[in-house]
From Swiss-Prot:
This is Histone H1.5. Histones H1 are necessary for the condensation of nucleosome chains into higher-order structures. The keyword 4Fe-4S does not apply. Residues 157-175 have a biased composition (Basic residues). Residues 9-19, 176-208 have a biased composition (Low complexity). Signal peptide: none annotated. It comes from Caenorhabditis elegans. The gene is hil-5. Its main location: nucleus. It comes from the Eukaryota. It is found in: Nucleus; Chromosome. Residues 1-23, 145-225 are annotated as: Disordered.
């Protein structure tokens, strides 16, 4: 039997996910955040214009001098001018700056006047307050009317008392009673007159009777003598 030599092939190692992750982390370089040595150009421009206080407006050259004197902008003058021009144009477009004369970045610049909020809101709030106060006054007026109505109702009830109703009734009764007294007086007056007229007739009769009686007595007494 002849022996056959078998050649062994080396095992190939497959890369794992962990090895890929470590390689990726090794290749990435952390970025260092560069802190700006100065604020944005528009902020520096507004500061320069407010401090320069030029009636006609501050020129780009005056603004550039103020910025470079206060902040460290580096030695690249052309780059600084380019940033300054673009910031001036953006300031005019955004109405932060007003260009008094010139075109583009050339000329003079002033700060835009801050627009006051419309007074309509204040007027509206004032109207609301007035409406509230008027409503309160109206409510209080209604309450006052109710109280006055109650008071007047009480007064009317007091006025309609039985005493005042009884007084005119008494007056009417007295007037009616007075009328018959007058008629009675008129009726009694002729009766009294008739009685007075009838009285002398009786007196005359009595006189006649007295005259006749002594004549009869004289006739009876004559034979006795």
């Amino acid at each position: 039997m002849s022996d056959v030599a078998v050649a062994e092939t080396p095992a190939v190692k497959t890369p794992t996910k962990a090895s890929k992750a470590t390689k990726a982390k090794a290749t990435k370089i952390p970025k260092v955040k560069v802190v700006a040595a100065h604020p944005p150009f528009i902020n520096m421009i507004t500061e320069a214009v407010s401090n320069l206080k030029d009636r006609k407006g501050s020129s780009r050259v005056a603004i550039f001098k103020f910025i470079t004197a206060k902040y460290t902008l580096g030695d690249q003058v052309n780059k600084t001018n380019a940033h300054l021009r673009s910031a001036l144009k953006k300031g005019v477009v955004s109405k932060v700056l007003v260009q008094t004369n010139g075109i583009g970045a050339n000329g003079r610049f002033r700060l835009a006047v801050a627009e006051k909020p419309p007074a309509v809101k204040k007027a509206a709030t004032g109207e609301q307050k007035v409406m509230k106060t008027v409503a309160k006054k109206a409510v209080s007026g209604d309450k006052a009317k109710k109280t006055v109505a109650k008071k007047t109702g009480d007064k009317v009830k007091k006025v309609k008392s039985p005493k005042r109703i009884a007084k005119p009734a008494v007056k009417k009764v007295t007037k009616k009673a007075a009328a018959p007294t007058k008629s009675a007086a008129n009726e009694t007056a002729p009766k009294k007159a008739a009685a007075t007229e009838a009285a002398p007739k009786k007196a005359a009769v009595t006189k006649a009777a007295t005259k006749k009686t002594p004549a009869r007595k004289a006739v009876g007494t004559a034979p006795k003598a």
